[in-house]
């Protein structure tokens, strides 16, 4: 059942029909040319994942559970020294990088634009992207690359302390029109809104060159801190808008099922993820819900990033909005079953078969 966007629709009354049903509704779903290439623009950060034995330790080190705090190099070192007894893993990260890696595993042609240092972390980061079949478009500068310390509570919630390093300092003229012309969709990380000239210029350039612009709001603190700027840029440039429940509430002041309707009036399609309840998608006078997949989360790190990958992959192959969201839900269901933002290599053949079933 489809619903008029101008009416309030309680979440309990939103239903997602079968994929077959939505295949018959392609005229509602913004079907686009197949085999679109997607490039991401985001903070290039090495993820250091720490599995906390108890969440009380967060207050001891002065970080609020669930927050994303910016830290300097000295704070980063102090936090990691305090948590030396916690199990840890390391992997190239940053929200958009996670999304581009997942897109490449699905078979999409994906690229990533970021800024790194001339250190070992930067070299490792670039090599890891190449191995994942993501085209790296890096701007290099002297000094240390950025990193994100991800502290995972026993209930799976993530708390982040981020040392950005050079990651957010990309200048507008460091992204050429020649690079952008090689792609059809650009996916921009909301965290980069701190660099207004970069985001504004890149969005304007992309639209002028005919690219679709996708934006992830990234964090409710980002929305609260840059709301006037977002209210200007989103209606003007953004086609596809991703947010979670708290980010949508920060932007609109509304609960999720109302927020998605309000957001859809500003963009081509709005997606609000709502955790274990799934996601809400609104576009072109319609609103519908997609069920969540996966069991009890071990770690929610990367759930939104992988959802975005699934959705954008669907769009790159001409799927409907609903099919795209179902692919996103599938990827989210897999990544919450592991520690870290990346799905294990061994799971991708199984995922690819599920994606084929959704599309067919």
Residue ranges and their predicted role:
Residues 1-9:
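Extreme N-terminal basic, low-complexity initiation segments
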Residues 33-111:
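Glycine-rich phosphate/adenosyl-contacting loop at the front of the ribokinase-like
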Residues 75-147, 352-358:
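Substrate-binding N-lobe of the ribokinase-like
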Residues 137-139, 150-193:
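Conserved phosphate-binding/catalytic loop of the ribokinase/pfkB sugar-kinase fold
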Residues 110, 136, 213-214, 270:
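Hydrophobic beta-strand scaffold residues
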């Amino acid at each position: 059942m489809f619903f008029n966007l101008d009416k309030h629709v309680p979440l309990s009354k939103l239903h997602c029909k079968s994929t077959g049903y939505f295949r018959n509704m392609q005229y509602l779903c913004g079907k686009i040319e197949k085999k679109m290439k997607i490039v991401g623009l985001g903070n290039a950060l090495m993820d250091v994942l720490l599995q906390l034995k108890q969440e009380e330790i967060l207050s001891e080190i002065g970080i609020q559970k669930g927050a994303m705090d910016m830290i300097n190099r000295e704070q980063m070192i102090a936090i990691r020294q305090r948590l030396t007894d916690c199990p840890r893993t390391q992997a190239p990260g940053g929200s958009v990088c996670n999304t581009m890696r997942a897109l490449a595993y699905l078979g999409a042609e994906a690229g990533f634009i970021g800024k790194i240092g001339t250190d070992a972390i930067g070299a490792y980061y670039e090599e890891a992207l190449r191995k994942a079949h993501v085209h790296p478009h890096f701007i290099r500068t002297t000094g240390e690359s950025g990193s994100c310390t991800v502290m995972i509570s026993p209930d799976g919630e993530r708390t982040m302390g981020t040392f950005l390093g050079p990651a957010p300092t990309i200048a507008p003229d460091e992204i050429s029109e020649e690079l952008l012309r090689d792609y059809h969709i650009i996916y921009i990380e909301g965290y980069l809104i701190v660099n207004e000239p970069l985001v504004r210029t890149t969005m304007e350039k992309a639209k002028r060159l005919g690219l679709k612009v996708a934006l992830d709001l990234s964090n409710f603190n980002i929305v609260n801190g840059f709301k006037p700027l977002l209210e200007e840029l989103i209606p003007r440039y953004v086609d596809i808008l991703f947010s979670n429940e708290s980010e949508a509430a920060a932007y609109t002041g509304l609960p999720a099922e109302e927020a998605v309707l309000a957001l859809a009036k500003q963009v081509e399609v709005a997606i609000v993820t709502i955790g274990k309840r799934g996601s809400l998608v609104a576009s072109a006078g319609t609103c519908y819900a997609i069920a969540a997949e996966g069991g009890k989360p071990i770690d929610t790190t990367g759930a939104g990033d992988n959802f975005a990958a699934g959705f954008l992959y669907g769009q790159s192959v001409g799927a409907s909005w609903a099919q795209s969201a179902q692919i996103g839900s599938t990827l989210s269901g897999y990544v919450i079953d592991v520690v870290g933002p990346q799905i294990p290599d061994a799971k991708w053949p199984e995922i690819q078969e599920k994606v084929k079933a959704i599309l067919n």
